[in-house]
Amino acid sequence: MGTPEFPDLGKHCSVDYCKQIDFLPFTCDRCLQVYCLDHRSYMKHDCPKGNRGDVTVVICPLCAKGVRLNPDEDPNITWEKHVNTDCDPSNYEKAVKKKKCPVPRCRELLTFSNTIKCRDCSIDHCLKHRFGPDHSCSGPKKPESSFSFMGFLSTNTKEAPASSSSSSRWSSLFASAEASISRLGNDISQKLQFASGNDGNSEKTQERNGKQNCGKVTVDVCPKCSRGFRDPVDLLKHIDKDHRGTSKA
């Protein structure tokens, strides 16, 4: 096998009746045996593990689900496991029964190409009954309005209570509503008074600061005799007259 220069070059085919030496042999990924070019496929060398990669799925007639058969397991055992654990006969109608147009006396099957959802009622219909008048569209669902205090007052002023118990209940609700409104008004008035008081205090503080600033007087001191002068001109005259024009100590 091989050549004098490369003695390990090439291998014999693993098929008994072949044994051909191949310098570029093929190794089977299932049985891990070496084969020549002619016997490299699973069918050519009758690979015992060639069907491990095959996927076989059987549709269950009871639930319409796909059951995958394991190559290393008996199909009967796989089927029994599915029947005992996974099988749900109620799913058969959902999977097999095809959707139809909901309009009475219309037997049109709804598929991907002929199905249109109504914008108002959000229900699928066929092309023939895609418009609202054709399928007696009920229109969009009205959203439930949230409880509002004004609506509560308006409805209760128009409609009288039917019994004494209901009237007492409505009166208690009215009383609590009036109390909450009066409490809210008091809070608002207190906040307004507090804000106006703060504004007055701030104005008084500004006036006081202005008066203090106006009362301050700047005095220039003579560096020679430490005499103070309010007017800088008087300070210069004093230096020229009394200190002969010298301000340095």
UniProtKB/Swiss-Prot annotation:
A zinc finger (C2H2-type) spans 220-243. Zn(2+) 1 binds at C13, C18, C36, H39. Zn(2+) 3 binds at C101, C106, C126, H129. It comes from the Eukaryota. A zinc finger (AN1-type) spans 7-55, 95-145. May be involved in environmental stress response. GO terms for cellular component: cytoplasm; nucleus. Residues 194-213 are annotated as: Disordered. Keywords: Metal-binding, Repeat, Zinc, Zinc-finger. Zn(2+) 4 binds at C118, C121, H135, C137. The gene is SAP13. SUPFAM superfamilies: AN1-like Zinc finger (SSF118310). This is Zinc finger AN1 and C2H2 domain-containing stress-associated protein 13. PROSITE patterns: ZF_AN1 (PS51039), ZINC_FINGER_C2H2_1 (PS00028), ZINC_FINGER_C2H2_2 (PS50157). InterPro entries: AN1-like_Znf (IPR035896), Znf_AN1 (IPR000058), Znf_C2H2_type (IPR013087). The keyword Cell wall biogenesis/degradation does not apply. Zn(2+) 2 binds at C28, C31, H45, C47. The keyword Signal does not apply. One of its GO terms (molecular function) is zinc ion binding. Residues 201-210 have a biased composition (Basic and acidic residues). One of its GO terms (biological process) is response to abscisic acid.
